[in-house]
Amino acid sequence: MITPTDKKSITDYGSPEQFLSQVNYLLGKQAYVGETASEGGFDANAVATANILETSTQEIGGKEYYYLSVLTRTADGDEGGKHQLITATVNGGKLYICKAQAGDKRWFKGARKFVENAATSFSVA
């Protein structure tokens, strides 16, 4: 995904966690609105949750990159959740984002290495 930005560097968004809060649309929006029973670790009236598992920064070719590993879950228990790896940088007035994901079951059956390779191989010339 490529979007215009007035930022000069990815670090202008703040920490990786602050960056994610500004682009949280990447994780999807909760479609259901209404009262729900709070169970399974979900907040009251919430049917989806996202947890940041890991963040890091790295400089490649003079550009700072953010790497984020996020586990999202929905109340329906869809595959136990999704592992979403997000790589982002800023160059030439544009925000570049690569998101790779796999369902929890597939993640632990071997998809992890492919998703990680896709996310870590992303770079902007």
From Swiss-Prot:
Record's keyword annotation contains Phosphoprotein: yes
Signal peptide coordinates: none
Keywords in alphabetical order: Phosphoprotein
GO molecular function: calcium ion binding
Stored InterPro entries: Mog1/PsbP_a/b/a-sand, PsbP_C
Keyword Phosphoprotein applies: yes
A cellular component annotation (GO) from this entry: photosystem II oxygen evolving complex
Entries under Pfam families matching the protein: PsbP
Annotated positions of the Phosphoserine modification: S15
GO biological process, one term: photosynthesis
Source organism, top-level taxon: Eukaryota
Family under the similarity heading: Belongs to the PsbP family.
PANTHER family (UniProt xref): PSBP C-TERMINAL DOMAIN-CONTAINING PROTEIN, PTHR31407
Name the record gives this protein: Putative oxygen-evolving enhancer protein 2-2
